[in-house]
Amino acid sequence: MHRSASRLTRVLACAAVPVILTVAGCSSDSGKKSGTDSGKKSDASSSSQPSSKPSKEALEKAVYAALPEPCKAVGAKTIETIVPKAKDANGTAAKSNDLASRATCTWNGLDEAGLKGSQYRWLSISLVRYDSLASVGTGSKRAEDEYAKQVEKAKAVEGAENVKPEEAGGIGDQATSVTFTTKKDGDFFNTSVIARTHNVVITLDYNGTAYEGATAPDQAKLLQDAIAATKETVASVAAANEAKQPEQSAQPEQQPSPSNS
């Protein structure tokens, strides 16, 4: 009887082992499956969330969409003052395929004073406007790059002497003046003023010389006149775009198509 009870105990103990192992195995598999499912759900959840970073940065719209007529960038009174006896007071416009982006006008005049000699003046106003383009940047940034190039160009004129660049405050967003002298058929006193107003670059070149014993031009006065003309041109750029805005707003708004419902 004792042996039978002992044997029965051993049989029950052995029979219980597979049950425990089976339960443990199920628990282990269940945990792995749960973890896998959780990982999949996490991956799916993260992939479904929209990216907070835009694929392309929104470009800042160019401030100016137009240029003034180059030969009207400065007034008739200004031309009469700084280019006396101008050959054509209306100026000569350079050819351009796109006057809304690039325009130039020039004036020249010889003021003859008999025995006192003659004074010659030449003026050029060039305007370049840049749009914002995804491939190259904003209009203002493109204008900044062009402004820097024009300043360096003015400082590196072939044959220039006594080159003196200076920052010119109070003109647009950036401005630099460059004065220098050159020798052609006389001593020419040159002034270049390069200015940037938002996405437009203005390059104003102004020079003068004296003939037949006339007093040489005053370089300081040439610079003063050039700066004043550049400020006037900056104002003309702004005015040209203010005039354009009412035209755009006057266009009738497109009405939504009627609903089919």
Regions found by a protein language model. Give the residues of each.
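A small/polar (G/S/T-enriched), proline-flanked helix-loop surface module common
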Residues: G31-G35, D43, P54-S261
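Hydrophobic beta-strand segments of well-ordered beta-sheets in folded domains
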Residues: M1, P50-S52
